[in-house]
Amino acid sequence: MGQKTNPISLRLQNVNRNFDSCWYSDYFYAKCFSRDLYLNNYINTFFKLYRLPQARVCVNFGIQNIKVYPFFCIPKASRVSLAKNLGLFQHLSKAWNSSPKYFVSSKSKQLSQLKINDASLPVNNLNNNLFFNSSKHNEIRNKQNFFHNLELNKLNLSFKNSAYSDVKNYSFLENISAKLLLNFKEKSVINEVYYTTTNLGQIGNNISTNSIYSKQDMSDNSSKSLLKMLLREYYKSSDNKSSILYENKSPKSLENIFGKINEVSNINKKNLYLLNSETDNIPNLYKRKSKPTKFLRNEHNKVIEDKKTSLYFMPDSNQIKNDIYQGKISKISSISNNSKDSLTDYNLHLYQAYLHNILGNSKSLVSRNQFKYKNYIENFLSSQYNIDSQLFPFISKQNWQSAGFIADEIVYFIERRVSFSRIKNRILRQASMQSYVRGIRITCSGRVGGKSKKAQRATQECVKYGETSLHVFECKIDFASRIANTSFGLVGIKVWICFK
């Protein structure tokens, strides 16, 4: 019996036994195969240059577009537990060093170099141990010290604002998910300021900058809810019911109003950026039932009249210039009519330092739409093949969904000089607990002795568990190979996983 034209159909059974799939695979096989190899090589090389974890890439070739699905693994819970069992306490704070921090922009790292010149007004930093093994009273104590210092700052705002007027960096809001602000029903701990006056001459007298924090609100709310409250002061929700009421909407009178607001709130010469809803929409900042905001551009002294506009601070100056050039953002030099609070620059500076301490240690995940290299890769692949290319990155928390994820775990611990015999015992114990895994086979070649004397010798060790038959069509085998760079040389790792 001769070889089948399409032998892969024997394993796929009822999926690939159609006439059209047979001639399509024969005619376009070489072209699709070369593109698949190129896309896998390009994406993994691109991620490697930016120190991203190696992804499992799946490509779907269509008639009018190409869809690429890279799958990343962020096994925080399993890696931390495995590090504890192997005794890597000194590396415990970096147990997920190959995961979410590479999805965070480098602009947020600039805040770590931000220094406060005044020694009498320190900002307490949150320790890294707070997220692993510290008690709850340490977290509450840090919050109380922060808010206590914030109250002391209110007494010296007159001369402190001039010192921090040039320090205006909103990059700490770049990677905060806007979903935290949706369905926000809790009472804010910050007293909001309402502009409800109709007299143009008395508007300056009705503005206040109260930011009083009660101890009861601090004890009841967790750090996540506190982060929501702080973010709400920057993202003005579309559900605001109070706004400035104008009787005379001439450009001259409105400029006087904004001038008085700037004098009281000390935010003059400050550029605020509003998203133009005609060219770009941000659905994450609004609820599903809410209508898109409509506001006019600030040309020929025109004023925004919509009462449901919201502010969106763009953190990157280069990104702002590009978006303004493309017409996505309309730059204005005034405040929208629904702005409630008038926080000073020094308070904004303290919010930056406090939020950066939270976000710098939490290593929170990001959604698919916030992947910073998505547009770049799509544009490059589209121009390369003259066809629409789409990238859909996914993040997985379970490392047993692919053999490549298990190989990355082995590489992580071998590079930290953990012997392969200790690693295989932990992995086989985890494999027995997975209901959808039929068997696993791991082969390691090189100096895999760890810190012992056996590390001087290069050996090849293999471990098997369950059924991993490579010559049976019914077995769903997944294969991956990795290379670990150790101080003793390179170590080759191969993993086979058989799924049920």
Curated annotation (Swiss-Prot):
Family recorded in the similarity comment: Belongs to the universal ribosomal protein uS3 family.
SUPFAM superfamilies cross-referenced by the UniProt entry: Prokaryotic type KH domain (KH-domain type II) (SSF54814), Ribosomal protein S3 C-terminal domain (SSF54821)
Alphabetized UniProt keyword annotations: Mitochondrion, Ribonucleoprotein, Ribosomal protein
Gene Ontology annotations of biological process type: translation
Single GO molecular function: RNA binding
Domain of life of the organism encoding this protein: Eukaryota
Gene3D superfamilies: Ribosomal protein S3, C-terminal domain (3.30.1140.32)
One of the record's GO cellular component terms: ribonucleoprotein complex
Compartments where located: Mitochondrion
Protein name (database record): Small ribosomal subunit protein uS3m
Originating species: Prototheca wickerhamii
InterPro entries: KH_sf_prok-type (IPR009019), Ribosomal_S3_C_sf (IPR036419), Ribosomal_uS3_C (IPR001351), Ribosomal_uS3m_plant (IPR044954)
